[in-house]
Amino acid sequence: MKIVNIIGGLGNQMFQYAFAVALKKENPDEMVYIDTHHFNYLFVKKYKTSNLHNGYELEKLFSNIDIEKAPISMLMKVTNYIPNFFLSRVARKVLPKRHTEYVAKLSESQTYIPGILSLAGNVYYEGYWQAAQYYINCREKLCYAFAHPKPNEYNAKLIKEITNSSSVGIHVRRGNYLLSPTYSGICNLEYYKKAIVRIKSDGKQHRFYIFSNDINWCRQNIVPLLGDSEVLFVTENTGVNSCWDMFLMSYCRDLIMANSSFSWWGAFLNNNAERVIAPYPWMNGRDTSGIYAPEWIKIDC
């Protein structure tokens, strides 16, 4: 039996679910579950704006999620179960780790760990599992699992435009990233300049779609880099609808990523992309070489 902990925002939940899918592919005769219990208790609502974001979102968005949630009886067999994410983190520092638990270090998040999918016996997996190599062989299954719901009129129109043009998605994430020692300073203006030059080197007339939580900054700083190219700002997908920026990115012919899980999934789920450009490194002070799919173009930052 294998159980994968689900926690964090939508992008991280997708990585963790994808890891469960990869486990099932590697261990077809074993039971594989996901653990979503940390989202079920009122205590987490107080902390919703930190790392729990909009709560458990996978089944709200995706109708093809088919890995079952672990019942408490199963959890008790493999982990020191406490039905609260924050209290369980405290307990992990006090109680010894059980032999059935594999708790990945943060430094391992973007690193492929050989043999991790084939550990013998009952295992409870806790981590972020953001290495692309885990998912290359189950990409078709993940595209099916993460097929988006029916779009509203605004996004349906954009999907049609994006698929019928020489579209380039540019994702710019600012906000809390500006103060983060882990993420700040990587996707700077020089990165976007290099990426845009790379895209425009083919001589085509591109239409650029800008996805960002700071549109005003993009108007002042990104638009001047685009010359006379057509530019459209995607502005209506906010709050619980912000996931639609990720879905729209998955239709773009070319994509300039930010160092964001939304960018990652927009690129990975994209069946139309001719070029995907990604920043390197992905994070400051950490080996993130495993997060990149082999075909992505890395630009040094």
Task: For each feature predicted by the language model, list its residue ranges.
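Secretory-pathway luminal glycosyltransferase catalytic domains
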Residues: 48-203
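A short beta-strand-loop structural module common to alpha/beta enzyme folds
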Residues: 30-42
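Histidine-anchored nucleotide/phosphate-binding helix
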Residues: 13-25, 192-200
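Short, aromatic/basic amphipathic alpha-helical patches
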Residues: 44-62, 218-227, 289-293
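Extreme N-terminal starter segment of soluble prokaryotic enzymes
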Residues: 1-3
